[in-house]
Amino acid sequence: MAYRKRGAKREDLSQQHERLQEKEIENNTDVTMENKNNNNNRKQRLSDKVLSQKEEIITDVQDDIKIADEVKKSSKEESKQLLEILKTKEEHQKEVQYEILQKTIPTFEPKESILKKLEDIRPEQAKKQMKLFRIFEPRQLPIYRTNGEKELRNRWYWKLKKDTLPDGDYDVREYFLNLYDQILIEMPDYLLLKDMAVENKNSRDAGKVVDSETANICDAIFQDEETEGVIRRFIADMRQQVQSDRNIVNYPSILHPIDHAFNEYFLNHQLVEPLNNEIIFNYIPERIRNDVNYILNMDMNLPSTARYIRPNLLQDRLNLHDNFESLWDTITTSNYVLARSVVPDLKEKELVSTEAQIQKMSQDLQLEALTIQSETQFLAGINSQAANDCFKTLIAAMLSQRTMSLDFVTTNYMSLISGMWLLTVIPNDMFLRESLVACELAIINTIVYPAFGMQRMHYRNGDPQTPFQIAEQQIQNFQVANWLHFINNNRFRQVVIDGVLNQTLNDNIRNGQVINQLMEALMQLSRQQFPTMPVDYKRSIQRGILLLSNRLGQLVDLTRLVSYNYETLMACITMNMQHVQTLTTEKLQLTSVTSLCMLIGNTTVIPSPQTLFHYYNVSVNFHSNYNERINDAVAIITAANRLNLYQKKMKSIVEDFLKRLQIFDVPRVPDDQMYRLRDRLRLLPVERRRLDIFNLILMNMEQIERASDKIAQGVLIAYRDMQLERDEMYGFVNIARNLDGYQQINLEELMRTGDYGQITNMLLNNQPVALVGALPFVTDSSVISLIAKLDATVFAQIVKLRKVDTLKPILYKINSDSNDFYLVANYDWIPTSTTKVYKQVPQPFDFRASMHMLTSNLTFTVYSDLLSFVSADTVEPINAIAFDNMRIMNEL
């Protein structure tokens, strides 16, 4: 009927359009009597409508929805029915358009990507090192003669491997914080030297050294003409030493003493632990191990060299559910998407045939044909896809503790009756408060109160009691009041299982007995007289209840099936299931609940073992990564505090922490939550390994500064030009190697107090001042760039008399405000500058002091996926039993 009227609607519209055009032409030519008549007629029609007692239904004008004349003449119920169908169709079109729109908005992220991000979080397999950890590397530097020209000889010094300081104003302390962050990222969980060892090319007997970088250093030193013969002979003898009885091997390595300290620490504090069959079996969640529906078997015995890294599964260190609405919403959303992917599907073969069921329902409703009666909409929207979607939504929302909101039409009594099953089975906490109140109020005012002839409930917004709680006190019927009492007290029970907080369902729901309570209440309601309502109304409600009560057995089975799937998958969750209402909600249509209630068959559907293992692995990996990133962030915050960078770096540290969790859209997180997160992180203790590593850096800051080409240990400032000195490493440069004879002021103290008067007085008295402290500087050793910035005539003689490429002029910038300091500054060819950089000589490379023997296990194998050793199968689904040792689905 709904679609047959579309032609009439279009016809009406076209006729209207023609009439309007004719009126416009007439108005242009003659604007008198007809206009007045039309106005009078319109006024008359309006007054008739206002004074008329005949009810007329007015709808929105969207999509030009109009009601044909024949429909207006039909009964009130038929009008409402047609309107509902048209409205439903319109809303469906809107939803489709909204989905299309969402996919075209660039900022929208499809949920598949969240799932991929979660599944891509792997255990720390990436931290298996193929090289030793190094901050330093030996480098050959030329020696400069007295006249500033290079010699052919070279000398070896320890320099920084990554000497990266950004341009401009930059605090050296930030360099050390970034270095520490880098070490935390690269810090290996275990070191197996045998895996990284490479052949020593210069060895006499095909010996091996610890890694490729050691081999390259040995190669370069061996080929250096100035290397002593004894060192060459030593390199030729460098090889590994195996002690097979103790399962250890020693490898020679070339390392700076600080790098040696780092690698020794990593070797002595490895995270690997022995692995055996018992550990793997205990790794499987206990409830799945003890579930008789799953048959688990170990495929093989593990060798004694098997190792694994124990996942870090500490609970609730940040309590993100408490006062972090945006973060908690993102976590629950990602958990919901993951949970939906593992909840088993109710395929069409496992459900009752939709056509057959609708036909049976039509017979139960005594519909000879699908005429427009209020009962016809009971059948609207029933399909297997909606049933499956509802099943997955309910279980996934409970697993992720994600709040649901209910979408329903008050006039569809079947939806409301299905909603009564939903509210009976799912705890109240799972629904948005406003949505729960609206649904309960609709059930009370449409079904419960009319049955007993009670007046409509007028619910005050903000009332602490829900409509069901108010109704429980007012209804005298024992069965109905008893059912309302159960719903009002239906909450999750919080139980700690295997150290994890679980939200468990009431035992009456788990075994399905609560459905009998629901049916008793429904039967009582259907027997009532509905004294204040028409007979048709009573008949519609009774038939809706009949449809649901005819499926009593299936509803008991459905309730047991939902409970079993929820509890089995819940065993794979490793993070505490904290329950807090989420900012955004998952929409649940009550028509899809009707589909599930009406189409559920007698086929048992339980998660496959592979699905359970996958869900468990993803949960463990995310949880472990979450805790490791917390440890990193806590360590960096502590380091920033001790380096006096607390205020400067704090927000970026928290942002990095969230980015590394991979599921957060960091720019959208409100600042207040960022700072609250900082406060929580600040209260946590630093993990031992990370603290020891930071102390190693702190103790050796000066050595690291000396090895950098971009960090100075101080600066000398004079009022008049100072003559540059020859330096063996750089030629004529404005570098001072000692501070003898200079008055020294601590740079940090100066910056803290801000009292520069002392410096000014000294400079005016022509006394050079030495500001001592680490500071960055910029170097440019290109002759061309210097000539480009200065008068070329200054360099004319030098260019003429010497080879330009033998010189190494250096330009130093202490910070973005300082002057530039050049090699040549006057016409006497005596290099001068008003500023000198105080730079200590880097540590010379001494082969004997740099050769270290490192010891590790000869061999072991680290396994990351422990569950790959377990083969699993299930019993025949029809025989699957629930916690009470009875079949999940009894209705056969």
Curated annotation (Swiss-Prot):
MF-aspect GO terms: RNA binding
Site (Interaction with the intermediate capsid protein VP6): F234, M238, M851, M853
Modification after translation: Sumoylated with SUMO1 and SUMO2. Sumoylation of viral proteins seems to have a positive role on viral replication.
Chain intervals with Basic and acidic residues compositional bias: 9-26
Subunit-level organization: Homodecamer; each decamer is made up of two conformers of VP2, called VP2A and VP2B. Interacts with a VP1-VP3 complex. Interacts with the intermediate capsid protein VP6. Interacts with NSP5. Interacts (via N-terminus) with NSP2.
Signal peptide range in chain numbering: none
Superkingdom in the source lineage: Viruses
Family classification: Belongs to the rotavirus VP2 family.
Keyword annotations of the record: Capsid protein, Inner capsid protein, Repeat, RNA-binding, T=2 icosahedral capsid protein, Ubl conjugation, Virion
Chain positions covered by the region annotation Disordered: 1-48
GO cellular component: T=2 icosahedral viral capsid; viral inner capsid; viral nucleocapsid
Comment field on protein domains: The N-terminus binds RNA. It is necessary for encapsidation of VP1 and VP3. The N-termini of 10 VP2 molecules form a cylindrical hub underneath each 5-fold axis of the inner capsid.
Pfam families xref list: Rota_VP2
Function: Inner capsid protein that self-assembles to form an icosahedral capsid with a T=2 symmetry, which consists of 120 copies of VP2, with channels at each of its five-fold vertices. This capsid constitutes the innermost concentric layer of the viral mature particle. It encapsidates the polymerase VP1, the capping enzyme VP3 and the genomic dsRNA, thereby defining the core.
Region (Hydrophobic): 406-426, 434-454
Protein name: Inner capsid protein VP2
Cited InterPro entries: Rotavirus_VP2
Ranges where the record places region 5-fold hub: 1-90
Residue ranges, compositional bias (Low complexity): 28-41
Locations listed in the record: Virion
Major place of residence: virion
